[in-house]
Regions:
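Enzyme catalytic cores with a strong preference for nitrogen-chemistry domains
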Residues: 1-219
């Protein structure tokens, strides 16, 4: 990474479940502010478009389609500020290890200058406590993929991915990432704030790169 300053803004706010149009407007409002402040990368939480957890809304094809259409609209709107946005993607890879799943993924899109520049699929799907992701999503199978902003190699991961020592972030760093961005929609727990902070600090030390950790609030 060169010495140029990279301006990164996190939109850590509420994205209600099912309110795709409302969430779209929130994202657009954030982009307008970010452009004014000359932000390089604007980060949104896990599944910011659909809200989290969307659960059985994912069984509605119209809901998935609306999520796609809005992502395309947001990409067309984007300009110099790059955005990392949580959404639901299709996962139709014939070689995928989870063929029994519905062919959708918990994903993050990277948008900039009117286009979708890249997509990351969440690899580790929690299926305990309030989490039921394995019921709906297929696992991502390209954990080491990188996203480039100018000459900076960036690894994107989603929530549970950052908890795994030999997981996506390690592969991304081995592939040359000099920064990790991890987006989340983890529920509030008064006892977990410190443990999450300690986890991210520990992973940053192990990987020897900065980690930006963004959560959703409200819901």
């Amino acid at each position: 990474m060169n010495k140029k300053t990279l301006r990164i803004t996190g939109a850590q706010m509420s994205f209600p479940v099912g309110a795709i149009q409302k969430n779209k407007q929130t994202i657009l409002d954030c982009f307008e502010i970010a452009e004014e402040k000359e932000t390089d990368i604007l980060i949104f939480p896990e599944l910011a478009l659909t809200g989290y957890p969307p659960e059985d809304l994912l069984l509605r094809e119209s809901f998935i389609g609306k999520n796609f259409a809005v992502l395309e609209e947001l990409a067309e709107f984007s300009s110099n500020t790059s955005g990392v946005i949580g959404f639901v993607d299709r996962n139709l890879d014939e070689d995928h290890t989870d063929k029994q799943k519905r062919g959708i993924a918990n994903a993050a899109a990277i948008i900039q200058n009117g286009d979708v520049k890249g997509i990351y699929h969440k690899c580790y799907l929690p299926n305990y406590s309030v989490f039921d992701e394995a019921r709906y999503f297929a696992k991502g199978n390209n954990p080491g993929n990188l996203f480039w902003y100018n000459d900076v190699a960036i690894g994107i991961s989603i929530c549970e991915d950052i908890w795994i020592d030999e997981g996506p972030s390690l592969q991304q760093v081995e592939n040359g990432a000099s920064l990790i961005i991890n987006i989340n929609a983890s529920p509030y727990d008064q006892n977990k704030s410190n443990s999450r902070k300690e986890l991210v600090i520990s992973q940053a030390k192990k990987l020897k790169v900065p980690i930006i950790y963004l959560n959703m609030v409200g819901g």
